[in-house]
Amino acid sequence: MSNKKNEDIEMRAVEGANDFGGEKDPFLGRNSPVLRPRGREPTASAYFGKLDNSPGASIIAYCLSSISMTVVNKYVVSGESWNLNFFYLGVQSLVCTIAILLSRQTGLIKNLAPFDSNKAKRWFPVSLLLVSMIYTGANALQYLSVPVYTIFKNLTIIVIAYGEVLWFGGSVTPLMLLSFGLMVLSSVVAAWADIQAAIDGVGHSAETSAALATLNAGYAWMGLNVVCTSSYLLGMRKVIKKMNFKDYDSMFYNNLLTIPVLVVCSLLVEDWSSENLAKNFPIETRNKLMVGMIYSGLAAIFISYCSAWCIRVTSSTTYSMVGALNKLPIAISGLIFFDAPITFGSITAIAVGFVSGLVFAWAKVRQKAQEAGLLPTTKPTMSASAQSNRDANS
């Protein structure tokens, strides 16, 4: 889905949190302690000052914004006849772009650079990768349950980690390998549980074939999404450093440049007949769908704000661990709101996926500590291309 910000969070987890955007947050400055005269009642500004520097509040806000984004995306694309994903993603990008511009006008975002056509041309290939990522993600979420979708998203971390080894001189530690094994295991268990639930639910009949075909389509889209997401995040990391973009610069260009692409794709590929529009937006749910589409665009801003807030008042390590822990409530939200099958296999897959995220987050913490010289370390193994690049630059 436009899990644009969710995907950015995945990348930040791989890198150790907020390494590829530059600034932590353009409009979240560190507040000085609020002082009030003795004997007076606390003012509203004092209360909000405390809240703004509360680690617990920032963590809760980040988790709620991320969960709500996934739930709303799933709700919108779960219609029986839904087939307007390009249109939906275009609305998301439009809402997000308008929200960023309004935030700049009101002073909430203080350092968003003016639009530069030369930068836009250089950034456009990244935006095309973003379109492929969000479109394949939307289709995968349409066919798969939220828990399965969340579990399979972990596979993106593996691809990105090895992409970093090849192109950025990264390394993979034994603890990371353990987490990767757990991620693969959780995905296999989730797929097996999903298929068994489909067979048990409808029996061996034509309905079984239809249910399995739906799951197979979901897995195919999920596989494409893993490739597209990894390509987008690795490509963005490479380009963003050359262009010296801040967090909200990249978000602004991403959303602005994807709007024409998504609109053209929607007009060319999707059915805009009145009959199909009526199927996609039934009268009984039309208003809810429109609200959900608008909220999903705003949610990208909310997640970005809460991510930076969490990093500012806690640490990148805490943020990374919270991102891993947040996989569990996201998966559980799918069980609660969308009647996903609750079986021994599905619960096991969620548990293993949750543990794999924790192990990976801990592995990144240890790796950063080693790089900082806080732990004993050995020379990491890297690819020949990365080693040659390092030798050439030394």
From Swiss-Prot:
Keywords assigned: Cytoplasmic vesicle, Endoplasmic reticulum, Golgi apparatus, Membrane, Sugar transport, Transmembrane, Transmembrane helix, Transport
Lumenal face of the membrane: 78-81, 146-150, 200-207, 271-288, 339-341
Cytoplasmic topological domain residue ranges: 1-56, 103-122, 169-174, 229-249, 310-317, 363-394
Membrane topology recorded in Swiss-Prot or TrEMBL: Multi-pass membrane protein
Transmembrane residue ranges: 57-77, 82-102, 123-145, 151-168, 175-199, 208-228, 250-270, 289-309, 318-338, 342-362
Places the protein is found: Golgi apparatus membrane; Cytoplasmic vesicle membrane; Endoplasmic reticulum membrane
Disulfide cross-links: none
Keyword set includes Transport: yes
InterPro entries: TPT_transporter
A GO CC term assigned to this protein in UniProt: cytoplasmic vesicle membrane
Keyword hit for Endoplasmic reticulum: yes
Quaternary structure, from the entry: Homooligomer.
Biological role: Involved in the import of GDP-mannose from the cytoplasm into the Golgi lumen.
Similarity comment: family membership: Belongs to the TPT transporter family. SLC35D subfamily.
Protein name stated in the entry: GDP-mannose transporter
Organism: Chaetomium globosum (strain ATCC 6205 / CBS 148.51 / DSM 1962 / NBRC 6347 / NRRL 1970) (Soil fungus)
